[in-house]
Amino acid sequence: MQSKFIVIEGLDGAGKSTAISFVRKYLEKNNLAAIYTREPGGTKIAEELRNLVLHNKYDEEIHSDSELLMIYAGRVQHYRNLIAPALEKGINVVSDRFYWSSMAYQGGGRGVELSKIRALNDNFLNGCEPDLVIYLDIDPILGLQRAQKVGSPDRIEKAGLEFFNKTRKVFKDLVKDSDNAIEIDAAKSIQEVEKQIYLILDKHFNFQN
């Protein structure tokens, strides 16, 4: 079976980590090897860039274009050093976020032109597209409430409600325009989200469990 690149997307507080735990449980049950990773981050250098973007400790504003480029510098490291090699070896890759998050957060939220972001993906990631995107949709107010229960808000989580409304809109538009993305209502119970994820994976892997 050809290796798959599966990405979980969604706003902060949508439950991506929980969803990934369901994907892990499913793949392990079906004896499918996989690595589990995240963005921003995924490699040592990418994690350093993540920390700079989310927890800027310097008395210097990060421009929206700079934010995008720092995230993409980490993404290139992540893709070339971890994602692509794993897929080439026949190992499935499951990632908490990929380039859709830049389209939504930096494109929708920050207002960076989407064409710039697509160009980065085409030029530096060989136009890599996930085999499956599971988008967890949630109202930004509920998402931020959930996120704040986990810990102190990071730099992006402090961006405000309007930012997240714009971010959500781009996510939903991306799902509508994609043939390999499925939206799940993340406000539903954990049990219902788990059930939907298993059904999606059954169909994707052509399994009948």
From Swiss-Prot:
Enzyme class: transferase
Family per similarity comment: Belongs to the thymidylate kinase family.
Protein name per Swiss-Prot or TrEMBL: Thymidylate kinase
Biological process, per Gene Ontology: dTDP biosynthetic process; dTTP biosynthetic process; dUDP biosynthetic process
Keywords: ATP-binding, Kinase, Nucleotide biosynthesis, Nucleotide-binding, Transferase
Residue sites binding ATP per the record: 10-17
Recorded name of the encoding gene: tmk
Catalytic activity: dTMP + ATP = dTDP + ADP
GO cellular component: cytosol
